[in-house]
């Protein structure tokens, strides 16, 4: 795999999408530092924190199982996932089906 891919900040489309019961979200971090990856419902309410902490440069992935921060299954619908660092942010949409 091309090493240049790891030098960019990026957020991949989740797969599968639509999903049930879980989906994988891949992302790349350009430099070591604080990273957060959160899931929001269509109204903008944060429903799940998937990553929150310092990560090394490179490619990372996380699996979301449709469970919110309170341990409850979320409703079917469209969700936004947002990757943020100290200097950059990017969002994408995903669909949870029941």
In which residue ranges do the predicted regions lie?
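Glycine-centered coil/turn sites that cap beta-strands in beta-rich domains
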Residues: 1-15, 19-40, 49-52, 61-64
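Short, acidic, Ser/Thr-enriched surface-loop or helix-capping motifs
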Residues: 41-42, 68
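Conserved Rossmann-like nucleotide-cofactor binding loop
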Residues: 45
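Short, surface-exposed loop/turn motifs with a glycine/proline- and acidic-biased composition
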Residues: 51-87
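Extracellular and select intracellular beta-sandwich modules with Ser/Thr-enriched
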Residues: 88-92
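Short beta-strand edge segments in extracellular beta-sheet folds
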Residues: 94-98
């Amino acid at each position: 795999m091309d090493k240049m891919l790891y030098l960019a900040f990026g957020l991949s489309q989740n797969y599968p999408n639509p999903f049930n019961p879980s989906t994988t979200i891949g992302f790349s971090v350009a430099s070591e530092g604080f990273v957060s990856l959160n899931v929001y419902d269509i109204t903008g309410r944060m429903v799940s924190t998937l990553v929150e902490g310092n990560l090394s440069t490179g490619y990372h992935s996380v699996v979301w199982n449709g469970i919110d921060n309170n341990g409850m299954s979320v409703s079917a619908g469209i969700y936004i996932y947002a990757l943020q660092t100290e200097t950059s942010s990017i969002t994408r949409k995903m669909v949870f089906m029941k």
